[in-house]
């Protein structure tokens, strides 16, 4: 504490004292309530023990200013209201003094701000400017400490988070950033400026209030620090997209990658869905008049749908009611409570009613009281928390076996597929995700029977803890009453708690496995989308086939269709068709053939390989490659394909799509629904809503970071840019067709439906080619003297005027755009243009040197002289924003980071499966990545499998170790053959290295 400022010290100490004496006051108030309410019984969290509390120390007013003294007292305004766990007490849902405390907190913050302003006003202007960043940093630290001390959360630097928090490694442009130098927090979106967080930083007010803090639960489930979760929630609440956050707000999320950010977003949506479901269920039960205080408390504590189902199932419409409900209707709840509160005065014989069913005998009375007690135990939060924590440290396994069904009902092939799981048992902490998905599929097909097994020691320790601690009667209980209590515990565990735990374990395992499967699908899709393009080539696309022939399509280097045809290579006409193929290749000077991997792919590949080996296509040096044709047939009959290639046969459209997948994979694959690309694992078994949301987000991420040229890109590609959708993309294309090309980014504000938020999200990912604009401007100037709506001057700034559109009210639009801005061809966001201009002035550069070697030399020399931190401090910005500016100024205009990824593997010959031998070293291309291994195409017609145990970090390069750039489709690898199973066509490989 010695390193803290004086104000921070006083506040932290004050909070500790308040927390200590608040617990003392709660105990004393609880004892007073017990005396007043005839000693109402409640479950005991700990063994009763006499404890002395030290008297509170009164602080001296002279040593502590009034603001500091009140700070700890009003800090509760940011805390989540805690509901007391009492069976007979009213549920506190809202704090009546909450608003007053918030008002006091705002007053204190206002006083601090005013005091800071007075100090700054007393300093000279030059001094204030040089020390501004330092003051902001100190204030940010003090605010962070104050916020942490006022909340119930553990600070991010404590040992609790030390072993669990995600730590991202330094990354390149694609995973977007390096580790931040410090944690900078903000309540609003910064404009490239260093920011600070308010005192109640970790408090997020949700529309639906629960008894748990959404920030804390989100942090626990994702293993991400609370301050990062708070920032992320605020960013998502402000409608920021993942690409925008990753590139331009990375200091607020501690450099998380896109996959981690998507995980936070999905978990946040799940928690909010649970909260909404809880409150809708509460309203339904209230209308039926079945709501009680204990039920309300239990429902507001629910964090999952399984917990809510467990609590609310007996109260659903049409339910026959539980055994406990029927016992309560008979009036036995008083007997059950008396057993815990006043066992010495309880007489079960007084409840006997010979003419009432369920009360006719003493045994009926005991069973009814037992059912009520079992229900109370199974719905008590403290009890459920204890049993869950107990299971985490004990042996809990999942078992699967062959289902006892007749062979007529189950396909024998399905039984053979699940041979590994017919006698399977594994600890739930060690089981793999793909095993869970396989077991679930077998269970759905009625092939397997699955159960969760909890060791008997868990039950014994649970019952012992309940008797001695949580559910111990207040006074001495007779042996027959203790027998009822023990029977209640056994009944509660066996009939209620055990099934609940099994459902929770299965649901958690399935949820985690589905999420990992979806994440793997997303990573594979990213690798495919970011495959390096092959520009500047004329390509022949081949869609193989037998009876209907092989469809051919030749496209130009600009993706224009030059020729289409059909050849029959596998119907005895191979020699005749070879001459036609040769003439086509020679006429269009095409030396690259792209073959789809569908039906007849192997035979078509052998056909072309044989002709190439015979040098049949001389003087052309022809090569070929195999590309996935997944989704090509679906796209060929879609309305978009009909609009793009009208009048062309759908089969020939597939050949065109296959060729374009090599020329520009991203531009072609975005036309296909992601789930049809087919690079996943169990993708048809997982939540389709989650799968679609994740894959759409991955497509948006890839398209945004590659960037698009607004004046030549297609509508299909444009709709996947962050902040845009189908309607906005359509409006942009219509504006471009009506008014000509966009001169700079500011003109986007004139497009219908593109508001300030949409412009903020998309502007940094839209590029404007300056050479194209200069050519267009010169042509327009020669013909008409002035570009429509654009006056060209020497200024680099932009003036905005109001343009009235009829009688309707219109937004302020850019009517006069003074000239093209060279910064519009970079990844620099318009909000940082002012900082970029000041940086250029500092290094002595100009806008016309962007992307040139001279600019790179000036930047390097300036960085060596000053350093990143000093430059960022001088420009009053963050290091991350400065890095984006440096990258934007250094990268050439034609920069495409996809060139760092692997290109298609072009071949001239073919290898057969029979030619392989154990120990042979081959090079191949990753075809698919799953949770259990990597499938590699080694050119023998059947993919080999690298088991996941053979993919170690030592064999991966530094960039491949990152989660977002894991080994995936398109990667070239060197492998060694470990085993060959020719009858089953299986090849086992070992990874040597990544090429």
From Swiss-Prot:
There is a cross-link at residues 84, 134, 166-167, 183, 185, 955 (Glycyl lysine isopeptide (Lys-Gly) (interchain with G-Cter in SUMO2)). There is a cross-link at residue 185 (Glycyl lysine isopeptide (Lys-Gly) (interchain with G-Cter in SUMO1)). Residues 919-992 form the S1 motif domain. Residues 258-288 form a coiled coil. GO terms for biological process: nucleobase-containing compound metabolic process; translation. Transmembrane segments: none annotated. It holds the Pfam family Tex_central_region. Keywords: Coiled coil, Isopeptide bond, Phosphoprotein, RNA-binding, Ubl conjugation. One of its GO terms (molecular function) is structural constituent of ribosome. Residues 116-132 have a biased composition (Basic residues). Residues 23-78, 116-164 are annotated as: Disordered. The modification Phosphoserine is found at residues 861, 964. InterPro entries: HHH_9, NA-bd_OB-fold, Ribos_protein_bS1-like, RNaseH-like_sf, RuvA_2-like, S1_domain, S1_Tex, Tex-like_central_region. Residues 146-159 have a biased composition (Low complexity). This is S1 RNA-binding domain-containing protein 1. It comes from Pongo abelii (Sumatran orangutan). The lineage of its organism: Eukaryota, Metazoa, Chordata, Craniata, Vertebrata. The gene is SRBD1.
């Amino acid at each position: 504490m010695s390193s803290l400022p004086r104000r921070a010290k006083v506040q932290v100490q004050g909070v500790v004292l308040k927390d200590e004496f608040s617990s003392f006051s709660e105990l004393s108030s609880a004892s007073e309530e017990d005396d007043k309410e005839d000693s109402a019984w409640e479950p005991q969290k700990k063994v009763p023990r006499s404890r002395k509390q030290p008297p509170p120390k009164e602080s001296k007013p002279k040593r502590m200013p009034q603001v500091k003294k009140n700070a700890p007292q009003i800090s509760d305004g940011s805390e989540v209201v805690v509901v007391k766990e009492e069976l007979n007490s009213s549920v506190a849902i809202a704090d009546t003094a909450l608003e007053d405390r918030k008002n006091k907190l705002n007053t204190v913050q206002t006083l601090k701000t005013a005091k800071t302003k007075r100090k700054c006003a007393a300093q000279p202007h030059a001094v204030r400017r040089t020390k501004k960043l330092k003051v902001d940093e100190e204030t940010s630290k003090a605010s962070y400490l104050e916020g942490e001390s006022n909340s119930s959360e553990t600070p991010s630097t404590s040992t609790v988070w030390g072993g669990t928090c995600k730590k991202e490694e330094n990354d390149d442009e694609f995973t977007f950033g390096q580790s931040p130098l410090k944690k900078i927090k903000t309540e609003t979106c910064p404009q490239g400026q260093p920011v600070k967080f308010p005192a109640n930083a970790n408090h997020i007010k949700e529309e639906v209030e629960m008894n748990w803090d959404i920030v804390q639960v989100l942090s626990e489930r994702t293993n991400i620090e609370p301050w990062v979760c708070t920032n992320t929630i605020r960013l998502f609440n402000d409608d920021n997209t993942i690409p925008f956050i990753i590139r331009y707000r990375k200091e607020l999320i501690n450099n998380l990658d896109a996959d981690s950010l998507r995980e936070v977003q999905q978990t946040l949506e799940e928690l909010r869905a649970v909260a909404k479901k809880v409150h809708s269920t509460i309203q339904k039960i209230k209308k039926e008049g079945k709501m009680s205080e204990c039920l309300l408390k239990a429902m507001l504590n629910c964090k999952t749908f399984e917990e809510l189902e467990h609590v609310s199932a007996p109260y659903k419409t049409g339910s026959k009611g539980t055994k406990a409900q029927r016992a309560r209707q008979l009036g036995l709840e008083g007997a059950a409570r008396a057993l815990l509160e006043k066992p010495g005065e309880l007489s079960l014989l007084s409840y006997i009613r010979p003419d009432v069913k369920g009360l006719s005998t003493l045994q009926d009375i005991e069973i009814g009281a037992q059912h009520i007690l079992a229900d109370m135990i199974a719905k008590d939060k403290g009890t459920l928390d204890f049993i869950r924590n107990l299971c985490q440290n004990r042996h809990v396994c999942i078992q699967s076996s062959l289902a006892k069904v007749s062979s007529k009902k189950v396909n024998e092939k399905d039984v053979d597929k699940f041979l590994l799981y017919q006698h399977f048992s594994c600890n739930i902490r060690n089981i793999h995700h793909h095993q869970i998905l396989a077991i679930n599929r077998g269970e759905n097909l009625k092939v397997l029977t699955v159960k969760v097994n909890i060791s008997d020691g868990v039950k014994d320790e649970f019952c012992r803890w309940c008797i001695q601690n949580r559910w111990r009667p207040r006074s001495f209980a007779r042996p027959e009453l203790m027998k009822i209590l023990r029977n209640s515990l056994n009944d509660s565990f066996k009939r209620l708690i055990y099934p609940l735990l099994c459902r929770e374990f299965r649901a958690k395992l399935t949820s985690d496995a589905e999420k990992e499967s979806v994440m793997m699908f997303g990573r594979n899709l990213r690798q495919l989308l970011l495959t390096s393009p092959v520009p500047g080539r004329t390509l022949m696309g081949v869609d193989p086939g037998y009876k209907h022939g092989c469809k051919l399509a030749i496209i130009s280097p600009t993706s224009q269709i030059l020729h289409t045809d059909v050849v029959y290579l596998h119907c005895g006409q191979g020699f005749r068709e070879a001459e036609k193929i040769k003439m086509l290749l020679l006429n269009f000077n095409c030396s690259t053939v792209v073959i789809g991997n569908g039906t007849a792919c192997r035979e078509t590949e052998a056909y072309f390989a044989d002709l190439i080996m015979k040098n049949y296509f001389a003087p052309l040096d022809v090569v070929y490659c195999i590309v996935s044709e997944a989704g090509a047939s679906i796209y060929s009959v879609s309305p978009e394909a009909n609009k793009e290639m009208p009048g062309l046969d759908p089969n020939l459209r597939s050949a065109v799509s296959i060729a374009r997948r090599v020329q520009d994979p991203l531009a072609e694959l975005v036309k296909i629904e992601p789930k049809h690309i087919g690079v996943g694992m169990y993708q048809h078994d997982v939540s389709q809503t989650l799968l679609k949301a994740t894959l759409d987000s991955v497509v948006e991420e890839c398209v945004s970071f590659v960037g698009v040229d607004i004046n030549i890109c297609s509508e299909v590609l444009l709709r996947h840019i962050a902040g845009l959708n189908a309607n906005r993309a359509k409006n942009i294309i219509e504006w471009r067709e009506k008014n000509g090309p966009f001169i700079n980014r500011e003109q986007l504000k004139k497009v219908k439906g593109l508001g300030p938020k949409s412009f903020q999200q998309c502007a940094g990912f839209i590029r404007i080619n300056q050479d194209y604009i200069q050519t267009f401007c010169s042509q327009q100037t020669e013909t008409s003297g002035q570009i429509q709506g654009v006056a060209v001057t020497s200024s680099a700034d932009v003036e905005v005027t109001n343009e009235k559109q009829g009688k309707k009210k219109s937004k302020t639009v850019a009517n006069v755009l003074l000239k093209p801005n060279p910064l519009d061809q970079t990844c620099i966001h318009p909000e940082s243009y002012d900082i970029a201009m000041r940086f250029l002035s500092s290094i002595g550069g100009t806008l016309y040197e962007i992307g040139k070697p001279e600019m790179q030399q000036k930047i390097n020399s300036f960085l060596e002289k000053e350093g990143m931190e000093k430059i960022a401090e001088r420009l009053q910005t963050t290091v991350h924003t400065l890095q984006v500016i440096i990258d934007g100024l250094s990268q050439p205009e034609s920069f495409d980071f996809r060139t760092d990824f692997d290109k298609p593997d072009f071949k001239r010959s073919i290898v057969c499966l029979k030619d392989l031998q154990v120990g042979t070293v081959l090079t191949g291309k990753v075809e698919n990545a799953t949770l259990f291994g990597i499938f590699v195409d080694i050119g023998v017609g059947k993919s080999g499998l690298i088991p996941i145990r053979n993919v170690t970090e030592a064999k991966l390069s530094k960039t491949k170790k990152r989660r977002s750039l894991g080994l995936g489709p398109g990667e070239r690898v060197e492998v060694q053959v470990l085993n060959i199973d020719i009858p089953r066509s299986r090849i086992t490989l070992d990874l040597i290295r990544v090429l």
